[in-house]
A protein has these predicted regions:
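Polytopic membrane enzymes that build or remodel cell-surface glycoconjugates and lipids
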Residues: 2-258
Length: 258
């Protein structure tokens, strides 16, 4: 009687569990490699230039609307200010804490990107390439070492990826309130960076131009008719956000002189 030890799962791991984790192995290895490479670069960096303004505000201001919604050269990033304030309160002056927070957010973002592409294409190669380009591009490098840029782009990237993930689930007919979760995540993305309004166009292009859950692309009219309330509510919130940005909670010119 012979046994095939190579096909036998590890002790304590059922065949069902082993099969369930198999599709995630390439993603886990890629994300681990990202952690090692980017973590080495980021943790050997330092704060400079505009970074110190954010550290100073977090250290000297209370957690008030004035602080959370204050603009910096015309840009508003509430989630970035919140993260900076809590990190400064919990780990005063710690550059390591800032970078570990950034790494965690980026790893979750890229894991979601991997899952979205794998779900749509069924190809590990396509998912790996989709992960590779933003993860190791110069833009990805900049948003991983410059804290001033991180406060805006990293939360925005995460919330947009959550919104797209939920949107794909909704388009494929999965049970659940995926349209709602997609909309809420996009609102969070708008609150991460005031320049992120273009994200709504990205969401609409995904629905209109990609044949997700249908044999052929929907086009502009069918994309709108699919979920009119979703688009109208997000467009209204976007208009209110841009209007509030135009009025400005705090004048950027005054802040830049502080």
């Amino acid at each position: 009687m012979t046994t095939d030890s190579a096909a036998r799962p590890a002790a304590g791991v059922t065949p069902a569990a082993a099969a369930r984790w198999l599709p995630y192995r390439p993603m886990i290895l890629a994300l681990f490699g990202y952690l090692v490479i980017r973590g080495t670069v980021m943790l050997n960096g330092y704060l400079y230039a505009d970074d110190f303004a954010f550290r100073y505000w977090a250290d000297t201001f209370g957690l008030t609307p004035e602080y959370v919604f204050r603009s910096y050269y015309g840009h508003v990033q509430p989630f970035g200010h919140l993260a900076q304030w809590f990190l400064q309160a919990a780990f005063p002056g710690s550059f390591t804490a800032l970078m570990l927070w950034t790494l965690l957010m980026q790893v979750v973002t890229f894991a979601l990107l991997w899952r979205i592409v794998l779900r749509l294409t069924g190809s590990d190669l396509a998912a790996f390439l989709a992960f590779l380009v933003p993860a190791f591009s110069m833009f990805g490098f900049e948003t991983g070492v410059w804290w001033c840029e991180i406060t805006e782009t990293v939360p925005y990237g995460l919330f947009m990826m959550i919104s797209i993930w939920a949107l794909v689930r909704a388009l494929q007919g999965d049970a659940g309130r995926w349209w709602l979760w997609s909309g809420l995540a996009f609102v969070a993305a708008m609150m991460s960076i005031s320049k992120g309004a273009v994200g709504l166009l990205v969401l609409f292009m995904i629905v209109a131009a990609l044949p997700i859950g249908v044999p052929r692309r929907r086009g502009i009219i069918r994309a709108f008719r699919l979920a009119p309330l979703y688009w109208l509510v997000l467009a209204l919130l976007l208009a209110l956000s841009l209007g509030g940005l135009g009025l400005g909670c705090v004048d950027a010119a005054i802040l830049s002189e502080e």
